Amino acid sequence: MRRHSETDVEEQTQELKTITQLQEQCRALQIQGVKENMDQNKATLALLRSNIRRGAQDWALAKKYDQWTISKACGKNLPLRLAHCRSTMEVVREKLRKYVFDRVNMHNLLIHLVRRRGQKLESMQLELDSLRSQPDASKEELRLLQIIRQLENNIEKTMIKIITSQNIHLLYLDLLDYLKTVLAGYPIELDKLQNLVVNYCSELSDMKIMSQDAMMITDEVKRNMRQREASFIEERRARENRLNQQKKLIDKIHTKETSEKYRRGQMDLDFPSNLMSTETLKLRRKETSTAEMEYQSGVTAVVEKVKSAVRCSHVWDITSRFLAQRNTEENLELQMEDCEEWRVQLKALVKQLELEEAVLKFRQKPSSISFKSVEKKMTDMLKEEEERLQLAHSNMTKGQELLLTIQMGIDNLYVRLMGINLPATQREVVLSNTLDLNSKLAYCEGKLTYLADRVQMVSRTEEGDTKVRDTLESSTLMEKYNTRISFENREEDMIDTFQFPDMDHSYVPSRAEIKRQAQRLIEGKLKAAKKKKK
């Protein structure tokens, strides 16, 4: 059995040795394979790094070339170059293509507009040449043209009048509606005023009640403050008396202790050890024991009194109780200061309430008469504003009519003076593109001054005067405003028609007198209103 077991063990060891050898060979092969893989990876890494470096150089070169091409494409346009410096070549190419396409479209549009304007200019030039080639118009045509211009001016003026009248009518309707709404809102305002008066009366009664309550509260606070102050003073005095008594007792105890210690020390020093007998020692011991007992009983009595006064059960609580009493005393002093400040504030509040009570007491209560007077004043003011509005409307219509008549007269004068040519020496006023009233007036002024100078230079004759009068009468014969006035009784017109029954009726007051009378009337009304309020 032993041999068999030894052989088995040897076989197992042989197998294990072979296994370990195989494992070592496998490990060596694995290490060799790993080294080969590492060498291959290093070679690939070097190749990849060189490729990356080459790619980076190519990319930098391509980027530089793109920037060069972009700057060359943008030219001297610095904003465009800065806008596209960070973009890629494809994006810049697309943007530049779009920009060039837009510019080409704009160029084509401008060329088209230039061609159209050239065609229009040619047509207008042809029309101008045709108009220049036409013969001069006859007098009848000029007269018809003048009539047409007058009719156009009249139509424009009537249209302006119609528009202004419509605007005035709309403004009148708006003002009427606004005044109606305002008038409808007056009863609500009066109700609000009545409610305010009622609220003021209720607030006045509440303020009176509040002032009475505040006065009662202040009296109660004053009474409580006096009581608390008196009780606090009594407590403070009692506490001080107790503390003084306790301090005196403690001082007595300390003095007794010190004197007893001193006496004992002296006795120990003076005592002769050789001569002292046992009897004297016993007697002295008895005396000292009785004295100590009396002293201890006195001290315990004093301590008990202090405990009962301070209300504590232990001796070591006495100091803390004294400190607590000191803190309470300080707190009470602070509370007294706060109460004093509160008392001052309450006094100020009472004074303010008394003043408000006096103001409200002597204030007049509102009545229905004041409301009626306010309503009457408001209606009078409304009527005055309506009258002012009507007056402003009438003045505005008069002003518009006057302006229209002036414009019509200036237009007619301008049309009539257009045919008069000024001499070469006198400079003609250059008219603006928009013929406004001022330019027309300046034009007419130049022509009229020239005509006035010519009239002064020409000598007047009766034949010329009659011709002018006849032409004026014939030209204004069919006008509406040209009415005949009959002067039948010329002598009666010279008679004074101001027949007054009395000289007082013929008196017309001056402006200062009217102002004085108005001031007197206003002062009288104000005095009457003040008397009613009182």
Swiss-Prot record:
Transmembrane segments: none
Coiled-coil zones: 10-54, 136-209, 323-396
Alphabetical keyword list: Coiled coil
Protein origin, superkingdom: Eukaryota
UniProt name for this protein: Coiled-coil domain-containing protein 183
Species for this entry: Homo sapiens
Gene designation: CCDC183
